């Protein structure tokens, strides 16, 4: 890609990342300390001058040969094209299962099928991406936020099947801690973009529980209990929150 502007964001690495990238002809943007994956992406997006942004992780798992298929989708009218990894490209069964859970929940919230919510390999129209920079966190969850933001804003998004190589280097993600944080992030996004899809089922569950408990106490004790009223009141409050 001789006409491409290649930017490498060095997020506080103290190895030879920056010097080797510069020797290869890339423009290097260096953070004095590690600010996070999302912060690195935002720095690169602000510095980029092109109409199309292509983002790849720096761990060697994404293939440059797949870039053209992503960019071609933008020419077809999509605003973002994402490389969706196959099942063999995930680091272990646990990571595959966790990502599958995220994908199902995000698909339910967005109303669109999302085969790979956490993929960092994507092509996107620069002007639209930059409009959402203020929403993106500095941490690893930027792919989730930008994908959900585009889908809920009505911008066409597509997914292209890719096969990712095994990553090089050590992952800093802790499955349990970061998995819980990730679910919390998806929940926050859901409450921002589609609150009723979260709160309506919860409200319905409380309502059914309250009615069922009322029926049980009425037929067994012949009276309406305070607990039934409390559960039904909780149902109404949760619905109003949504």
Go through each PLM region and give its residues.
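A recurrent flexible, glycine/aromatic-enriched loop bordering the glycosyltransferase active site
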Residues: 86-93, 107-121, 139, 167-169
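Structured catalytic core of nucleotide-sugar glycosyltransferases
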Residues: 1-100, 108, 123-134, 145-152, ...
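Short, basic, helix/turn surface patches
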Residues: 58-64, 108-113, 185-197
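Short glycine/serine/threonine-biased micro-segments
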Residues: 10, 34-36, 48, 75, ...
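Short, non-helical or kinked segments that cap or interrupt transmembrane helices
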Residues: 63-67, 116, 175, 224
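Low-complexity, intrinsically disordered, cysteine-poor segments enriched in small/polar
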Residues: 96-100, 104, 108, 175-186
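Short, flexible coil/turn micro-motifs enriched in small/turn-prone residues
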Residues: 7, 31-33, 39, 72, ...
